[in-house]
Amino acid sequence: MTALEILQARDGLDPAEISYFTHGTTVGVNTVIQRNGHDIALFTTRNFEDVLEVARLKIPQIHNLYSVRPAPLISRDRVFGIDERMQATGDVLVAPREADVAAALEAALAAGCRGIVLSFLHSYRNPQNELAVKAMIEKLAPGLPVVSSAETWPIIREFERTITAVISGYVQPRVAHYLDRFETVLRDKGVTCPLLITKTNGGVMGIDQARANACR
């Protein structure tokens, strides 16, 4: 913002003439490092509740007997198993029941969670069960943020897909709030062009996409 003000004062820049605007931010990364993100719960396939604890069984220093892995962003008591099952072929073996989802949701809200992350087995192949549970939660708790791993990062490998969705749910409210303020200030200063946000892979995305997929 300071640079924009300097260009206006020194060179007579008209913000309305700006045709390309890209912004990079570390708000999401800082949120993870500082561990001050959103209070969220994880709903996963029943009997796979240890996905974040097991991870890839790697430790930071393999030859150090005292090496400790970082604690998961979601503690084990906020991980809830849902009775559902998708086969690796994408065929539904067990469809989720609303009563089961409602019980898990009630427990998550009672624990103080303000958002839900969904990551079911094989949802990268077929997101039907995840999207069904997302719709149930949106009906039972309107306005509660819900992140689906199948929508966020639909790739094979359960831990990688789950942790990506968890990070997205963890940082999304903070990133969205930051981008809302950022866009408001720029528009107030007269910038009218589309606002692009730098992605972690070096590309760019629109600001609306950045709000929805904060982990990218």
Segments (PLM) and residue ranges:
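N-terminally biased helix-coil "hinge/interface" segments that flank
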Residues: 1-216
